[in-house]
From Swiss-Prot:
Belongs to the XseA family. Its main location: cytoplasm. The lineage of its organism: Bacteria, Thermotogati, Thermotogota, Thermotogae, Thermotogales. It comes from Thermotoga sp. (strain RQ2). It is an enzyme of class 3 (hydrolase). It comes from the Bacteria. This is Exodeoxyribonuclease 7 large subunit.
Length: 394
């Protein structure tokens, strides 16, 4: 370090050159709350404040231009940082002031957070694959929300053999941020096939919890694939950008994630057809190979056969091994067919009736809870061998 003594002016001038020569402090935009407006000698001095910080600002000639700043208003100011050498202070020289409403504030925060995540490469990370036939699905939403009912209704309509785990959280309001983080962390502890994050539509303020940086970073920590269905068609939150799959609505997300039972049957039928065709082709091919070997052996003269008896034995050994290999393959494929059969049988809704259970229907609909019935209701009792009518007496 040089052995040199600076004057106050030299230090301030050096700092001025550093700050005013920094492109990140020139022609930039800053937002905050207007405070301490002080017109003086044709200029307007004021502060931009937020919870734990303050930035001194000035509009040169602003008073003469008829500019009137309002205390307490949120504003976006444009300009550059400058150093005032006589006092050794810095301030923001404003070239333009624009008031912000609540929507404007949310939009600025949205863009700022999105840009930060983009610069960190978090929006371009590889996407996880969403399983086609999930069995365990976690849902992060309010237990009282219409979004949850949309997902449950879709699951019932599709008759899919799935387990649903609900991780309750507020989806709007002051507590949404902390509760969403807790729900995400809880879901990460479970052995799930995927996680759905859903809620219905609303204003930017209602949906803001899904734009909070802390919430987004917690979503990125999930071990499971993430599917979002937040808001309506026009709504877009930052959680959608980091999800592995993003749908426009809760119902859309549910339809994407939950397979239809008919699709499962179709896939099984297709697999069985391909398996049978593959086995048939394999047997045909091996049969032709054996016929070819047999024909070649017949063409060989007796004398040559006697001289090459060991070759014949070798062919027999190979044929035996081939036969054994075919039988092993057949047994393996038979096990697969039996497994598929058991899976199809487990999907049969009438299976429990063979064990003595009774299916209760009211007006053609299955009764799932006792609260769905009242005294005097006429119901149908479905046994394994027929149906009987009954009346609720208590």
């Amino acid at each position: 370090m040089k052995d040199y003594t600076y004057s106050v002016t030299e230090i301030n001038e050096y700092i001025k050159d550093l700050i005013e020569g920094d492109p990140y402090l020139t022609n930039v935009s800053v937002y905050g709350e207007i405070s301490g407006v002080r017109p003086r000698k044709g200029h307007i001095f004021f502060s931009l404040v937020e919870e734990n910080a303050r930035l001194e600002c000035v509009i040169f000639g602003g008073d003469n231009m008829g500019i009137r700043l309002q205390e307490g208003r949120m504003a976006l100011v444009e300009g550059s940082v400058s150093v005032y050498i006589p006092h050794g202070t810095y301030r923001f020289i404003c070239s333009n002031v624009r008031y912000l409403d609540q929507a404007g504030m949310y939009q600025i925060k949205f863009e700022t957070t999105l840009k930060k995540l983009l610069e960190e490469g978090l929006l371009s990370r590889p996407k996880k694959t969403v399983p086609r036939f999930p069995r365990k699905i976690g849902i992060i939403t309010s237990r009282d929300s219409a979004a949850l009912q949309d997902v449950i209704r879709t699951a019932r309509e599709r008759k899919a053999p799935i387990e649903i785990y609900v991780f309750h959280t507020s989806v709007q309001g002051d507590s949404a941020r902390e509760e969403l983080i807790k729900a995400l962390r809880k879901a990460n502890e479970y052995d799930l096939d995927l996680v759905m994050i859903v809620r219905g539509g609303g204003s930017k303020e209602d949906l803001w919890g899904f734009n909070e940086e802390d919430v987004i970073r917690e979503i990125l920590k999930l071990r499971h694939p993430v599917v979002t269905g937040i808001g309506h068609e026009i709504d877009r939150v930052i959680a959608d950008f980091v999800a592995d799959v993003s749908m426009h609505t809760p119902t859309g997300a549910a339809e994407y994630v939950i397979p239809d039972a008919s699709e499962i049957h179709e896939d099984l039928d297709s697999f069985l057809e391909k398996l049978i065709a593959s086995l048939s082709n394999r047997f045909d091919m091996e049969e032709r190979r054996l016929e070819t070997l047999y024909f070649r052996l017949r063409m060989i003269g007796r004398r040559k056969l006697e001289l090459n008896e060991f070759k014949i034995e070798r062919v027999k050994e190979l044929a035996a091994k081939l036969r054994k290999k075919l039988m092993d393959c057949f047994e393996q494929d038979q096990e697969k067919l039996e497994s598929l059969g058991r899976m199809l049988e487990s999907l049969n809704p009438l299976r429990p009736l063979e064990r003595g259970f009774v299916l209760v229907k009211k007006e053609g609909e299955i009764v799932k809870e006792s609260s769905d019935l009242k005294r005097g209701d006429v119901v149908s009792l479905v046994f394994k061998d027929g149906t009987k009518k009954a009346q609720v007496i208590g």
